[in-house]
């Protein structure tokens, strides 16, 4: 087998394992890949692959912290899976703040950014699990807060 074929097979197996959303550590991924026949795999290679493919740690359906791959490269739309990532929405006189599951803030912020000024969003800043949203001058923070809560079906 050519080296490029081996690499392609490794990438396919790696992505398939992460889609299972059951691996909480890099060591678990290494062991699973070894069971798939990739004898020369190690933790540092898995770490590089996680970074290369933009993997994040988030909670699965069993509420376990696991590695997973971002599902969409384009601008995401609101779906039930995005709604589940929003843990809390709050606001003050200046900002609306969203708390998400670990690693989910960037994904949700990109979706909010795509809504833009037409929805009253002047700007969005996201960290790993926190998003700050600033309203435009044409909307109050309270109105933006209510819109964001509706968007994510957040009852708060």
Curated annotation (Swiss-Prot):
Gene Ontology molecular function terms on file: arginine binding; DNA binding; DNA-binding transcription factor activity
Coiled coil: none
InterPro entries: Arg_repress, Arg_repress_C, Arg_repress_C_sf, Arg_repress_DNA-bd, WH-like_DNA-bd_sf, WH_DNA-bd_sf
Pathway(s) annotated for this protein in UniProt: Amino-acid biosynthesis; L-arginine biosynthesis [regulation]
Subcellular location: Cytoplasm
Gene Ontology cellular component list: cytoplasm
GO terms under biological process: L-arginine biosynthetic process; protein complex oligomerization; regulation of arginine biosynthetic process
Family to which the UniProt record says this protein belongs: Belongs to the ArgR family.
Protein name: Arginine repressor
Organism, scientific name: Vibrio vulnificus (strain YJ016)
Upper lineage: Bacteria, Pseudomonadati, Pseudomonadota, Gammaproteobacteria, Vibrionales
Underlying gene: argR
């Amino acid at each position: 087998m050519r080296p490029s074929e081996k690499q392609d097979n490794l990438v396919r197996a790696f992505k398939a394992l992460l889609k299972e959303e059951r691996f909480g550590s890099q060591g678990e991924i290494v062991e699973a890949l070894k069971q798939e026949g990739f004898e020369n795999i190690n933790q540092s290679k898995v770490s590089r692959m996680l970074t290369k493919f933009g993997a994040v740690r988030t909670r699965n359906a069993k509420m376990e912290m696991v590695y997973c791959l971002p599902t969409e490269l384009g601008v995401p739309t609101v779906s039930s899976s995005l709604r589940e990532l929003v843990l809390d929405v709050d606001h003050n006189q200046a900002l609306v703040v969203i708390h998400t599951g670990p690693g989910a803030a960037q994904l949700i912020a990109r979706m909010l950014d795509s809504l833009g000024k037409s929805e009253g969003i002047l700007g969005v800043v996201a960290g790993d699990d926190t998003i700050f949203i600033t309203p435009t001058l044409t909307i109050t923070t309270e109105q933006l807060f209510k819109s964001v809560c509706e968007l994510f079906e957040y009852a708060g």
